[in-house]
Amino acid sequence: MTRPVVTRFAPSPTGFLHIGGARTALFNWLYAKKTGGKMLLRIEDTDRERSTQPAIEAILDGMKWLELGWDGDVVYQFSRAARHREVVETMLAAGAAYRCYASAEELTQMRESAKAEGRTRFYNGLWRDRDPSEAPEGVKPTIRLKAPLTGETVIEDQVQGRVVWQNDNLDDLVLLRGDGTPTYMLAVVVDDHDMGVTHVIRGDDHLINAARQKQIYDALGWELPTMAHIPLIHGPDGSKLSKRHGALGVDAYRAMGYLPIALRNYLVRLGWGHGDQEIFSTKEMIEAFDLPAIGRSAARFDFAKLESLNGHYIRQSDDQTLVTLLEDVLRYIPHGAQIAAKLNDTTRAQLLRAMPGLKERAKTLLELLDGAGFILADRPLPIDPKAQALLTAETRHLIGRLRAALEAVTSWSAETTEAAMRAFAEANGLKLGGVAQPLRVALTGRTTSPGIFDVLAVLGRDECLARLADQASE
């Protein structure tokens, strides 16, 4: 009987949840969902100097924001150190590991000799077969794996295919340090085994680790999980991903106004494809995703594509959801608290009314917020330079006349104000644009905005007449 699929996402809490880690988490989550399995979350916090509680919280927060839920409790690797040492004791008893008393000077000499001779295997087996009675007094040994000296170590990888290493190039790696703390290589194997992990899906920078970890699995007589090493993410020019290219934390994308569903959709297409389809619902992603469809070549990050996808999802979102998302993003942006202070039942209703026009232009929530600035602006309205250039004496005089015409409108709506302005334009030999642009400048402080009659309706009669008065001349 086939075992249920168990994947795991195992970040190190030394910083934020970066974009590559987020994609790894997504691929693990998708594969678990597709197969009816589970995705577990393990925090690999054995590096006590670099692991921090804020980083752990940032990882958990990023996962929750991306809506990548995990099954069961979070496992903390450091808390399992006693179990890791227990496994090493069984390996020592079985002759699969040995105590190494080599000094730092001896190890340095081995490295230099290996480098000079062009060997990748640097440890020369100094203590591999020596009698323990020869151990120097007062020296705490490391524990090393008694790795095979000949033959091959082979990984049948779901993405990379068959990968072969010659065993004479692989060291007797350290399992326990002299202070008794387990190494990453050992801890990962023990934890994956004990957690019942069936599929290890991670970046291909871990491919060499797969060979070393397989040797530990073999020494313990444990079944190796299915391996899938996914390509790294590069910048648009093919170079290593940098902050300039998008190597940012998930929290930064939230603060830039991206939607979780858009980021998930973008990340799933970095290295994985399903024909020419670009836009996937979560359900479609789960149904279509499979490990062999992941390519081997590094994926290239493209901000323009991400923005385009985000704009699509903004346009597809219902208006009330967008008002809620706008309010949520204020917690993560500069001056967000000042903007939040202006939100009340009236301004929320205005945002909701304006949303159909606002969302057609916006590619991010920040652009949406910027477009909605006229709703939340205080009088006298700040006027941007392009709009200021249009506020000539002639235009200010026209604004005064437009205000007078609008003041006569009693039942205020987009339709009634449009009718009044069309009548004014016709009576004065003007095109509608010659009326709309002065109104736009006076009411929004910009030369672009949602439809001007929608703006009039959203702001309401009193606010519109007051803003027009601010810019008008007699």
From Swiss-Prot:
Segments carrying motif 'HIGH' region = 11-21
Q: Where in the cell is it found?
A: Cytoplasm
* Entries under Gene3D superfamilies matching the protein: 1.10.10.350, HUPs
Q: Would you indicate the residue range of the signal peptide?
A: none
Q: Specify whether Protein biosynthesis is a keyword of the entry.
A: yes
Keyword Nucleotide-binding (UniProt): yes
Q: Which UniProt keywords apply?
A: Aminoacyl-tRNA synthetase, ATP-binding, Cytoplasm, Ligase, Nucleotide-binding, Protein biosynthesis
Q: Which InterPro entries match?
A: aa-tRNA-synth_I_cd-bd, aa-tRNA-synth_I_codon-bd_sub2, aa-tRNA-synth_I_CS, aa_tRNA-synth_I_cd-bd_sf, Glu-tRNA-ligase_bac/mito, Glu/Gln-tRNA-synth, Glu/Gln-tRNA-synth_Ib_cat-dom, GluQ/Sye
The short motif 'KMSKS' region is annotated over 240-244
Chemical reaction(s) catalysed: tRNA(Glu) + L-glutamate + ATP = L-glutamyl-tRNA(Glu) + AMP + diphosphate
Instruction: Write down the EC number.
Output: 6.1.1.17
Q: Identify the enzyme class.
A: ligase
Gene Ontology MF annotations:
ATP binding; glutamate-tRNA ligase activity; tRNA binding; zinc ion binding
Q: Which GO terms describe its cellular component?
A: cytosol
Q: Which residues bind ATP?
A: K243
Q: Which SUPFAM superfamilies match?
A: An anticodon-binding domain of class I aminoacyl-tRNA synthetases, Nucleotidylyl transferase
Which terms does the UniProt entry file under GO BP? glutamyl-tRNA aminoacylation
Q: Which CDD domains match?
A: GluRS_core (cd00808)
Q: Which Pfam families match?
A: Anticodon_2, tRNA-synt_1c
| Record's function text | Catalyzes the attachment of glutamate to tRNA(Glu) in a two-step reaction: glutamate is first activated by ATP to form Glu-AMP and then transferred to the acceptor end of tRNA(Glu).
User: Entry's HAMAP family?
Assistant: Glu_tRNA_synth_type1
Family assignment from sequence similarity: Belongs to the class-I aminoacyl-tRNA synthetase family. Glutamate--tRNA ligase type 1 subfamily.
How would you summarize the oligomeric state and partners of this protein?
Answer: Monomer.
Task: Output this protein's name.
Answer: Glutamate--tRNA ligase
